[in-house]
């Protein structure tokens, strides 16, 4: 589908910043959040505030952790490390604390709005931390709990916010749906005639970002951390792939860990260490009016995404913040080192229409004078999620950056998450969606950042349809048969940068999305036909985006077997489904390992786990081991032939005997197809008889043509990722990063069948799995859930009820055309054993946008539970 045509234009670099990087606006964010100056500090001077700030001549020779960046995130990381017992922490700030973005942040404290459990918990923790900071440090942060309201002015946003509010309430956010009239009572100056509903959190509000940062820094100092201002990091030290210290103009600091919290400089800082941090600064705007007598200081924060704006009182006037749908990237070539408290000259012509639209929500603001129209840079990422975690390129080098305008909102929680991660070696929350290793190096290319950022900032206030795909910076990665799939009517979506067929339009129909919605869209019947063809006939599915590795060497089998919970070093020519676990017995990867021969293994993982899987192998293979990992993803196309007639079709194009006797389930063997050779593996992710073909990319078009021609007589149909989702969900197949994640025990995830506790040599995480088994019946389990009513749709984060009580939420879902309703996988938690009796004795329901629907819950696959169809 087409988003605004302007998305197709490359974003321009803006060079309208004021000439002096040190210069800062006299207004800043008004009296509440101006850039810090000595007179703002009750102790009588910025440097004098921190008694432990050292002169460069007294630079510490070593520290356990060096945090680079003194904004909200850097000080929060230091604060939490120190409070968790790691007191030998040094924060390096190249200028002064809060410089860059923190000083001009809006200071909103909002817990509502996310359908990520991790993000919601970080928001809640952050608010709670800010509430207690003053008592701990003696420094006020200006936290005013005046409340927060987001309004829905159209049906789709109402649907979205009802879905979000149900999930947020489950997570402990006290959000209430209110009428437009009630919105007007809470914010009397707002126009409410078109508002369908508002969503109100009384305990949320606003605070001063500068004071929050200073309080966190003081709290860190009180626990023994050191804060150094005016000390830039000019280089990284490392030894054999492990960080060893930081270079400064005044000498080096040896360090066991380095944390890059450099905000919009994080990409440039990462480059010094060879670490990829793909984020980009963009223009971000707000306007402050002259004083409005009718405006009271105690008004709640108001947000209206359909008008591009958020609103709060500021110094007697109205602050109008903007997230325009098409933004302007700033300084593609790099943020200047001395741009600390600077402003960008605002583009009135570009922003005028958006500003007009936003101010119409508060009509009185249109007649008020303009006190300040401010533009400052803020960093955004390609998928609007943070960049967090240990860098795959350099061990013990951590990053927390690219907060996409939620740095203050999640700052406390982000610091806690990263501190726990560093100290314990692994995180205690789901980080699959924000881990730095999800990105690839090309996403830091200037053209990519310029083009994608035009769209990404605007996504903050777009309606977050679950089927939406980013439209910019596309076309870089295509499979070898892309043109042939396009000719078949493929509608492509962004799949980790690849062009992945989502669904196929029938002949004569343009593959476009006519209208995004939460309901059945124009492509729904095309998807249904692909699903049914897989269950009844045969389909071709391009999965070339999957991560593929060839692992070779005399010790390759033993090392892979140690990483794998299942036995993967058995007979040659056999594929094995397995998980990789950490020492705590929770999941790190979900993949297949195929033994080609005693010294060659074929490892296949999901696209999102690509770099994580590669890094996991490299980090766990001893340096002197005779084992070598080669990423062959781009070298091989993956074409899957699936369905009851798949054997019949493939047998027409190969001389290899594919009978059930000669080529049973889990067999892997090289076969001939036309003039090509392909690795053929009998396996399925769709719940039917099927085969995966791995073909050298240069031969893939030839193989495709042979299969397509032979398929004409057996009704071959092409199928896309929508069908993949619905078919695998009916079967209850897991997808790491969607319905299972790094917080799940392999047993809780329902994958105990893929664990071999008795194999010689054991495996990484075995002791934790045994300990989990010893605890007795599981009280937390992944359960398949089917909505009995065929009409509603599930996507993610719908709350599951048992006997009227919330017991979990849907992690991922699709529509089960064979089962006759929406179907998903939910992690259920209870104070008792979750077994068949627990399921049978429950009255199950799912909340979908505020309405509850009867449901069926099952521990066994609802489709073909006896696995007969895949082994026939």
Q: What does each model-identified segment do?
A:
Residues 36-65, 83-87:
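Extreme N-terminal leader/targeting segments of oxidoreductases
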Residues 82-102:
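Glycine-rich FAD pyrophosphate-binding loop
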Residues 429-430, 436-872:
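Glycine/proline-enriched, intrinsically flexible loops and inter-domain linkers
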């Amino acid at each position: 589908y087409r988003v605004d045509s302007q998305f197709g234009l490359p974003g321009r670099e803006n060079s309208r910043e004021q000439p002096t990087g040190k210069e800062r606006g006299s207004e800043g964010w008004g009296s509440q959040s101006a850039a810090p100056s000595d007179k703002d500090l009750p102790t009588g001077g910025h440097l004098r505030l921190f008694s432990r700030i050292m002169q460069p001549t007294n630079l510490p020779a070593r520290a356990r952790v060096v945090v680079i960046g003194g904004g909200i995130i850097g000080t929060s990381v230091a604060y939490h490390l120190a409070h968790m017992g790691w007191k030998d922490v040094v924060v390096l700030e190249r200028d002064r604390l809060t410089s860059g973005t923190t000083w001009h942040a809006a200071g909103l404290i909002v817990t509502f709005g996310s359908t990520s459990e991790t993000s919601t918990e970080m928001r809640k923790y952050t608010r709670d931390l800010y509430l207690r900071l003053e008592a701990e440090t003696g420094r006020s942060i200006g936290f005013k709990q005046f409340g927060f309201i987001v309004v829905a002015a159209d049906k789709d946003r109402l649907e979205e916010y009802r879905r979000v509010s149900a999930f947020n309430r489950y997570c402990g956010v006290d959000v209430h749906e209110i009428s437009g009239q009630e919105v007007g009572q809470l914010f009397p100056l707002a126009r409410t005639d078109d508002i369908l509903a508002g969503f109100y959190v009384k305990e949320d509000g606003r605070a001063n970002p500068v004071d929050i940062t200073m309080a966190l820094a003081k709290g860190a100092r009180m626990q023994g951390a050191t804060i150094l201002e005016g000390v830039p990091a000019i280089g990284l030290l490392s030894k054999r792939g492990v960080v060893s210290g930081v270079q400064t103009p005044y000498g080096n600091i040896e360090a066991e860990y380095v944390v890059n919290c450099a905000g919009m400089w994080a990409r440039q800082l990462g480059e010094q260490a060879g670490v990829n941090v793909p984020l980009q600064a963009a223009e971000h705007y707000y306007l402050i009016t002259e004083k409005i007598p009718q405006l009271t200081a105690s008004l709640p924060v108001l947000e209206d995404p359909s008008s591009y704006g958020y609103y709060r009182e500021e110094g007697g006037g109205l602050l109008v913040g903007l997230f325009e749908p098409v933004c302007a990237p700033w300084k593609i070539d790099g943020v200047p080192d001395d741009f600390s408290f600077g402003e960008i000259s605002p583009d009135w012509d570009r922003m005028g229409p958006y500003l007009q639209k936003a101010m119409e929500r508060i009509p009185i603001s249109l007649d008020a004078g303009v006190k300040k129209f401010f533009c400052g840079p803020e960093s955004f990422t390609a998928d609007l999620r943070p960049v967090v975690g240990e860098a795959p390129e350099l061990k013990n080098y951590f990053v927390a950056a690219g907060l996409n305008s939620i740095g203050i909102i999640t700052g406390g929680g982000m610091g806690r998450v990263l501190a726990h991660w560093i100290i314990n070696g692994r995180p205690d929350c789901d980080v699959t969606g924000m881990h730095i290793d999800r990105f690839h190096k090309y996403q830091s290319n200037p053209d990519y950042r310029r083009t994608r950022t035009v769209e990404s900032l605007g996504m903050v206030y777009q309606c977050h349809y679950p089927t939406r795909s980013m439209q910019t910076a596309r076309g870089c990665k295509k499979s070898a048969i892309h043109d042939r799939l396009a000719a078949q009517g493929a509608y492509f979506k962004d799949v980790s940068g690849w062009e992945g067929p989502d669904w196929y339009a029938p002949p004569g129909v343009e593959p476009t999305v006519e209208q995004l919605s939460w309901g059945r869209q124009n492509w729904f019947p095309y998807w249904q036909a692909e699903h049914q063809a897989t269950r009844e006939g045969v389909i071709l599915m391009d999965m070339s985006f999957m991560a593929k590795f060839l692992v070779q060497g005399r010790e390759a089998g033993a090392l892979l077997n140690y990483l794998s919970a299942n036995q993967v070093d058995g007979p040659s020519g056999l594929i094995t489904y397995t998980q990789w676990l950490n020492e705590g017995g929770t999941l790190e990867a979900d993949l297949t390992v195929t033994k080609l021969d005693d010294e060659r293994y074929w490892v296949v993982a999901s696209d999102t786990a690509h770099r994580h899987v590669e890094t996991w192998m490299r980090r766990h293979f001893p340096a002197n081991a005779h084992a070598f990992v080669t990423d062959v993803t781009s070298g091989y196309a993956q074409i899957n032939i699936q369905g009851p007639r798949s054997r019949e079709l493939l047998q027409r194009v190969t001389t290899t005997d594919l009978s059930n006797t000669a080529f049973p389930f889990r067999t892997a063997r090289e076969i001939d197809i036309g003039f090509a050779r392909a690795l053929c593996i009998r396996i399925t992710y769709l719940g039917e008889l099927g085969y995966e073909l791995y073909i050298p990319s240069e031969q893939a078009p030839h193989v495709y043509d042979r299969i397509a021609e032979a398929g004409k007589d057996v009704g071959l149909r092409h199928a896309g990722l929508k069908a993949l989702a619905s078919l695998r969900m009916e079967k209850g197949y897991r997808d790491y990063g969607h319905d299972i994640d790094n917080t799940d025990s392999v047993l809780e995830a329902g994958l105990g069948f893929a664990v071999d506790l008795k194999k010689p040599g054991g495996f990484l995480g075995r002791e934790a799995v045994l300990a989990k088994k010893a605890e007795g019946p599981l009280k937390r389990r992944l359960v398949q859930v089917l909505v009995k009513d065929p009409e509603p749709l599930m996507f993610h984060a719908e709350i599951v009820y048992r006997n009227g009580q919330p017991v979990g939420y849907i992690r991922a879902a699709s529509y089960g055309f064979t089962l006759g309703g929406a179907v998903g996988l939910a992690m259920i938690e209870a104070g008792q054993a979750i077994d068949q009796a627990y399921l049978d004795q429950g009255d199950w329901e799912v909340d979908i946008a505020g309405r509850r629907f009867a449901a069926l819950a099952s521990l066994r696959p609802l489709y073909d539970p006896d696995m007969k169809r895949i082994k026939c």
